C-alpha cells in the first residue's frame, strides 16, 4: 500500500502532495468554513496544513512514519479565504538519529510567505513502521503533473 489521505472525510483539509526536488509541495484551496475571522484563514487551520505537509516529508523522503513532538509556528501575514489557492512547501533541515527537523512555509496566491513552521518529528524505524503501523512505502503525485499556477 502507498500513503493515502482520506479524501472522503468531509471535515478533512483534502491536501494533495507533490515532490519538487528536496521539497514536498501542496497547492490547496482555502474554503470559507475554515475562516477564523471574516475572509481570514484560521491560524489553527494553517498550523494543520503545515503539520500535515511536514508529516508527508517524513513519509515520502524518509519512507517511514513519525509523530510531531514540537511545532513552532510564526504567522507573518493573514491568508484570505477568497484566494484561489495557497502553496505549501516543506523540506528536511536536519536529522539527528530519529529526530527530524523540518521547515515549512505557506505562501499566498501572490507568492508571499504568510506562515512559517519548524516541526520536530520523532520518527520510527522502517521496521517498526512496517510491523506496527503497517506502513510499506509512500508515493506522491508525479512531479510532471504538478499543477501549473
Residue ranges and their predicted role:
Residues 53-87, 92:
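Hydrophobic beta-strand-centered segment that forms part of the acyl-chain substrate-binding groove
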Residues 2-4:
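Short, small-residue-biased leader/transition segments that mark boundaries at the very start
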Residues 25-51:
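A conserved, well-ordered hydrophobic junction motif at loop->secondary-structure transitions
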Residues 11-13, 22-24, 44, 67-71, ...:
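A generic structural signal for short beta-strands and their flanking turns/coil linkers
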Residues 80-82, 93-149:
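HotDog/MaoC-like acyl-thioester-processing domains
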Amino acid at each position: 500500500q502507498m500513503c493515502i489521505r482520506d479524501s472522503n472525510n468531509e471535515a478533512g483539509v483534502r491536501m494533495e502532495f507533490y515532490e519538487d526536488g528536496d521539497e514536498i509541495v501542496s497547492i490547496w484551496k482555502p474554503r470559507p468554513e475554515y475562516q477564523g475571522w471574516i475572509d481570514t484563514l484560521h491560524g489553527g487551520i494553517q498550523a494543520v496544513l503545515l503539520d500535515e505537509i511536514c508529516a508527508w516529508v517524513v513519509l515520502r523522503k524518509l519512507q517511514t512514519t513519525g509523530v510531531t513532538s514540537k511545532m513552532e509556528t510564526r504567522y507573518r501575514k493573514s491568508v484570505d479565504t477568497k484566494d484561489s489557492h495557497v502553496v505549501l512547501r516543506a523540506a528536511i533541515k536536519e536529522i539527528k538519529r530519529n529526530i527530524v527537523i523540518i521547515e515549512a512555509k505557506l505562501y499566498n496566491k501572490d507568492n508571499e510567505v504568510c506562515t512559517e513552521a519548524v516541526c520536530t518529528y520523532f520518527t520510527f524505524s522502517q521496521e517498526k513502521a512496517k510491523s506496527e503501523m503497517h506502513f510499506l512505502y509512500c508515493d506522491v503525485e508525479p512531479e510532471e503533473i504538478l499543477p501549473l499556477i
